[in-house]
């Protein structure tokens, strides 16, 4: 699908970052991404820049991308999303 995600772990294991990049012109209104922990993920930045009011998404026990947990959110065409957890 030409959508890539990766995690940047902090040395303290707090404030880790999850990046999701959509390299296609297709909007994904309910894109599901696999995540390493069943936690809340806060969307802090997207293709428009830093968010004044970050949105929070709760991971659920639903396998995706070879990960035990995942959550769904809207991903813009050629969009970028950065989450902290």
Where are these regions (language model features)?
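Carbohydrate-interacting/catalytic domains
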Residues: 1-85
């Amino acid at each position: 699908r030409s959508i890539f995600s990766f995690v940047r772990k902090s040395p303290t294991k707090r404030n880790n970052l999850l990046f999701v990049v959509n390299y296609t012109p297709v909007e994904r209104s309910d894109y599901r991404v696999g995540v390493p922990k069943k936690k809340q993920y806060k969307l802090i930045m997207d293709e428009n820049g830093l968010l004044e009011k970050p949105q929070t998404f709760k991971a659920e026990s639903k396998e995706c991308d070879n990960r035990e947990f995942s959550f769904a959110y809207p991903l813009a065409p050629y969009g970028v999303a950065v989450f902290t957890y």
